[in-house]
Amino acid sequence: MQREPGLSNGWFAAPPPAAFRDFAAHYRRTYNANPPRIATLSYDAISLMALLSDGRPYDRFTDRTLTDPNGFSGVDGLFRFHDDGSAERGLAVLQVAPSGFTVVDPAPKTFPSAGF
């Protein structure tokens, strides 16, 4: 992307880059290989299942716990599930620069409340 003149200074939404760098460094130390970019999705899914499995036996994987409006924090940032089955992510806004990507607006740490 950095070499494409039409994208120079363009903005796009993406997971926070620092978290993936940390994840990738740990992965390389452990497996002596670079992780596929989508490895964080699997990691976050398993982490969520581990978190929910620690809950009360009758309330572990219910619609209510899976659609917690506060969401969950993963390697790729904040995410939550809605009643209709869709997912929402808290993404950063990055800018394309010749030297790489710069963060224009960091990813949110929490979702805004649904109240008015």
Segments predicted by a language model, with ranges:
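Extracellular/periplasmic periplasmic-binding protein-like sensory domains
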Residues: 1-43, 56-57, 107, 111-114
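Segments of small-molecule ligand-sensing domains
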Residues: 31-103, 115-116
